[in-house]
A protein has these predicted regions:
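A short, well-structured alpha-helix characteristic of acyl/acetyltransferase catalytic modules
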Residues: 1-50, 174
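Terminal substrate-recognition subdomain of acyl/acetyltransferases
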Residues: 1-2, 161-175
């Protein structure tokens, strides 16, 4: 599913391009990012191009590259597993560079995505899954208004270590 560009005060959400693949291949191979995001294997530029051209252009998802207002790539976000009959979807966001975190980019991106999910796509529920050891992400989503609704105990395994997988959600009426 393709979508127009969305502009905020600090971020631009735009269609993903093959040129973005180098940024993602670089960051998505960092062990900390792989752990926090649940990536089970490294990626490279060619794999990311395939994701951009195939997997990120399906009828049940909409993906964006996040850029700052000057157009520099800082991450990606998407609504995936959109199920209009049930009015629910999952949300994902990755801003991998620590220098770009805690600057309001993630908060604005999530708000733009939730506005789109609830208002444009008429979703009633938006879910997100978080690696339990990623406590910064858990606090971030709580601050936005997501509520924890379940725990998949030891549902995530990375590099010889188990972690719980935390299921969170926000409803239209809470937004």
């Amino acid at each position: 599913m393709e979508h127009k560009e969305i502009r905020g005060k600090r971020v631009i959400l735009r269609e993903q391009k093959e040129d973005d693949a180098e940024f993602f291949a670089y960051w998505f191979n960092h062990p900390l990012i792989m752990f926090q995001c649940g990536f089970t294997e490294p990626t490279d530029k060619e794999k990311k191009i395939k994701y951009i051209n195939e997997y990120h252009k399906t009828e049940d998802s909409v993906w964006f590259t996040i850029t700052d207002i000057d157009g520099s790539v800082i991450g990606e976000t998407g609504l995936l597993r959109m199920f209009p009959a049930w009015h629910c979807t999952d949300l994902t966001i990755i801003i991998p560079d620590p220098e770009k975190q805690n600057k309001g980019y993630g908060t604005e991106t999530i708000r733009l995505m939730l506005d789109m999910a609830f208002n444009e796509y008429k979703m009633n529920r938006v879910s997100i899954g978080v690696v339990g050891l990623n406590t910064d992400a858990l606090e971030f989503y709580k601050k936005i208004g997501f509520r924890q609704e379940g725990i998949q105990e030891q549902g995530y395994y990375y590099n010889g270590e188990y972690s719980d997988f935390i299921m969170m959600r926000i409803l239209r009426e809470e937004w």
